[in-house]
Amino acid sequence: MSNIHPTALVADGASLHPTVTVGPYAVIGPQAVIGPGCSVGAHCVIEGRTTLGADNRIFPFACLGAAPQDKKYAGEPTQLVIGQRNTIREFCTFNRGTVQDRGLTSIGDDNWIMAYVHIAHDCVVGNQTILANNATLAGHVQVADLAIIGGLTGVHQFVKIGAHAMAGFASRIAQDVPPFMMVDGNPLAVRGLNLEGLRRRGFPAARMAGIKQMYRLLYRQGLTLEAACQAMAELPAAHPQAAADVALMRAFLAACTRGIVR
């Protein structure tokens, strides 16, 4: 049997691995699936079609899988899917998806999600991200791997935040943030590259040189976005170690629908 506190309410039909622990007064709905090694804190609520992978730690009063805050929602059986080894701190709220998108809100693996973070319907959060206290993702936001979002930052609907990007405290993000960039403020502005983050992740100097050249093309040479993208196509010849990073950046820019922070 799972280690379930006697005051917790686990509905018939819920699927809990035998190694799951559930704290006092937690409420788990009939469609929840909770994988091995998960810890559900006191007073947590897990409802709807919510699936958690292995070894997630959910702190007290988090609410996962509630209906999307979308007036068009009419009770469709949408989902919230969370991967493995995530830390989800107190009072976080993650909503299920809507049928206007994929019907799915998804969160990957190894994310560090601090207190009071809100992840709205249809968001896609990658792996190894950090979302600091009170960060708020509106509907359909995409946050790529290893991005960092500062506390009290608000992210507009449909915005994409690229891999390795970093947003400072209390920023207002209404346009897409390209990979590797560091942004801050209200109004938001690019402050440079997230160099310290890249160094901590072991990026060698030769690879960093290619990323710096992409930054110059986007932000320091007065080029249009189209011209900067075309110029980037030539970078792998001079910076072969950054070829994958160039491909990542060009794919991100091609997929932008809200324009980028410039």
From Swiss-Prot:
Belongs to the transferase hexapeptide repeat family. LpxA subfamily. GO terms for molecular function: acyl-[acyl-carrier-protein]-UDP-N-acetylglucosamine O-acyltransferase activity. Its main location: cytoplasm. Gene3D superfamilies: Hexapeptide repeat proteins, Udp N-acetylglucosamine O-acyltransferase, C-terminal domain. Its EC number is 2.3.1.129. It is an enzyme of class 2 (transferase). It comes from Verminephrobacter eiseniae (strain EF01-2). It catalyses: a (3R)-hydroxyacyl-[ACP] + UDP-N-acetyl-alpha-D-glucosamine = a UDP-3-O-[(3R)-3-hydroxyacyl]-N-acetyl-alpha-D-glucosamine + holo-[ACP]. It is found in: Cytoplasm. Signal peptide: none annotated. HAMAP family: LpxA (MF_00387). GO terms for cellular component: cytoplasm; membrane. Pfam families: Acetyltransf_11 (PF13720), Hexapep (PF00132). Homotrimer. InterPro entries: Acetyltransf_C, Acetyltransf_C_sf, Hexapep, Hexapep_transf_CS, Lipid_A_LpxA, Trimer_LpxA-like_sf. Keywords: Acyltransferase, Cytoplasm, Lipid A biosynthesis, Lipid biosynthesis, Lipid metabolism, Repeat, Transferase. One of its GO terms (biological process) is lipid A biosynthetic process. This is Acyl-[acyl-carrier-protein]--UDP-N-acetylglucosamine O-acyltransferase. Involved in the biosynthesis of lipid A, a phosphorylated glycolipid that anchors the lipopolysaccharide to the outer membrane of the cell. Pathway: Glycolipid biosynthesis; lipid IV(A) biosynthesis; lipid IV(A) from (3R)-3-hydroxytetradecanoyl-[acyl-carrier-protein] and UDP-N-acetyl-alpha-D-glucosamine: step 1/6.
